[in-house]
C-alpha cells in the first residue's frame, strides 16, 4: 500500500543516506511517476534533497540555510495558496482565539487579517510569529520548545500547552478517503492531533495537489473536521465522500 511504501522508502533513504533513483525504482517496484510523487512529498517536508540521479537524506545536523524553511516553499502553488489563505482568513472573527499551523498555505491567512480586532493567534511556527510582530492588531502566542531546523517550528510535549481554540487552521501533506489526514513529521503530527482535540472548529487547508495522497503519519480522522478549504473543486469521489461525512468543501 502507498502508506507503507512511503514509510519504508523514507526509512531506506535515511539508513543509506544517499540513494540513486534506479535503486528505489527496483527495490519498491514502482513507476518513475510514482517515485517522483513520493520524493516530492519528502522534499516538501525537508526530509530529503534531490541530486542528479538520486536523493540524499537531509540530516538535521547539517548547517542550516539563512533562508527560512517557509521561504523555500513559497513558490510551490503560490497563487493557489494565496487563494486558500484568503478564504480561511474570512472565517476569522473579532475576538477569536485561533491556531495557525506551519506551512505556506496557513501562513498566507495573515495577509488578510489586518483589519481584525482582539484576535489571538497561537502557533508553533517561527515565521507566523515574525509576521504577527508586524501586525499590532493581533496578539501572538508562540508555542515554544525545541526548534526543528528543517521546518522552522517548535516541538515540545503538547500537554504543556492546554490552550482552547475557537478555530484551528491545519495544514496537511495528504488527504485520502481511506487514510484521512496524513503528514510526514511525527512531531508535527502530534501537535496537530492535540490542537484538533482542543479546538471548537477545525479547518484543513490544502491545495489540489494534496488530494489522493497518503503520507506515512496519520494525525486526524475526518470526524473532527468542519471544513476542507482548497483552491478548486476536487473530484466527484471526494465531493460525495465529504458530503457523506457532513464536511463542508470551500473553494
Language model: regions and residue ranges:
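HTH-adjacent hinge/linker in prokaryotic transcriptional regulators
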Residues: 2-8, 14-22, 27, 33, ...
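Conserved phosphate- and dinucleotide-binding cores of soluble alpha/beta proteins
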Residues: 11, 21, 50, 127-251
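A short, charged, Gly/Pro-tolerant segment at domain boundaries
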Residues: 29-30, 247
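A conditional alpha-helix N-cap/helix-loop micro-motif detector
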Residues: 78-81, 122, 184-185
